[in-house]
């Protein structure tokens, strides 16, 4: 990071030891025609919260990837409402193959920077359950900014 006032280069502060992944969970996998993307996301979130030993009310940040099988422009907002939480920090990301790593980096920075204490990092989709080429194209078209 550059310091414009003095022209000097400032050392970045390490966040090592300040943030941690404290829980992990997953949903059913495979063809699950009776489950919506939201239901699958909820399964994974509940499992992660149980693994972490924290309550739903303690989640104050949500980062999600886009869901191709669900037409939500801001999946993090739609999921938060579905899951019954009101985060102060939220975003939906799509960075191709780097989405998961990017979400974890942003979550760590948000926690270290004081924007949130517990960030739910979530990716969910239902690609084996009825995602047609038309639905995929429509989802991508409707989600663009």
Language model: regions and residue ranges:
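Conserved phosphate-binding catalytic cores of ATP/NTP-utilizing and phosphoryl-transfer enzymes
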Residues: 101-109
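Conserved "HGTGT" condensation-loop signature of ketosynthase/thiolase-family condensing enzymes
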Residues: 1-92, 109-113, 123-145
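Active-site nucleophile and cofactor-binding loops and adjacent substrate-binding regions
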Residues: 90-100
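Flexible, low-hydrophobicity surface segments
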Residues: 116-119
């Amino acid at each position: 990071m550059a310091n414009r006032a003095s022209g000097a280069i400032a050392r970045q502060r390490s966040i090592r030891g300040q943030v941690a992944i404290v829980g992990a969970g997953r949903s059913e996998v495979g063809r699950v025609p009776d489950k919506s993307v939201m239901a699958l996301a909820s399964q994974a979130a509940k499992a992660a919260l149980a693994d972490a030993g924290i309550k739903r009310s303690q989640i104050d940040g949500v980062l999600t990837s886009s869901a191709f099988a669900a037409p939500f422009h801001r999946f993090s907002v739609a999921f938060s409402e579905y899951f019954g939480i009101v985060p102060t920090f939220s975003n939906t990301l799509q960075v191709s193959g780097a989405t998961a790593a990017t979400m974890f980096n942003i979550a760590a920075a948000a926690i270290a920077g004081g924007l949130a204490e517990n960030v739910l990092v979530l990716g969910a989709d239902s690609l084996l359950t009825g995602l047609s080429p038309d639905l995929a194209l429509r989802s991508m078209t409707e989600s663009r900014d």
